[in-house]
Amino acid sequence: ELLFHAVEAVHAVRRMKFGSVLDLGCGTGLAALPFRQFSDWMGGVDLSPAMLMQARGKGLYDRLIESEVLAFLSSEAEIKAGYHLVLAADVFMYLDDLTSVLKAIAQVLASSGQLAFSVETHAGDGVLLRETLRYAHGEAHVRAALAAAGLKLISLDFASTRTEKGVPVLGLIVVAGN
């Protein structure tokens, strides 16, 4: 829902409509739900067959693929796909290197395509591995990774992306484009 509101704010001046949407780490389809009505086509990628089965049951996706995100993005067919919007909600917390995945996403975006993602963050610079085995990415690191991938930052907002033991976990909600 946080990703949806961030993308919606970017499109407040014009009607929000996307030809094709790709949901990376789609899980059960929770992040895709608010976007479905604004897309002509929606695909989802996830490592877990159980999650994909739940997503399939929701009827949101035109295509579901069992794959690791970077492997999927690097396939020749996907490089030619040209997605209008790529979503990655609660996915990049499992990656220490954002630059590689952002470069791969930049390759599959259509002209004027956008990427909306969330990351956990921390007050310092760089990347921090937490006790939870989830990575927290500093704001400067996120900005540098976007620039290295050739993506332009459109919006960056601080928000609690989840709670851990009853305590809100600070995150960033990012929208970028090519």
Language-model features, listed with the residues they occupy:
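Conserved alpha-helix/loop element of class I SAM-dependent methyltransferases that forms part
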Residues: 1-18
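Class I SAM-dependent methyltransferase SAM/SAH-binding core
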Residues: 20-22, 28-74
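A conserved beta-strand element that flanks and buttresses the S-adenosyl-L-methionine
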Residues: 87
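A short glycine-rich, Lys/Arg-flanked "PGG" loop and its adjoining helix->strand segment in the class I
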Residues: 99-111
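Conserved S-adenosyl-L-methionine
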Residues: 152-161
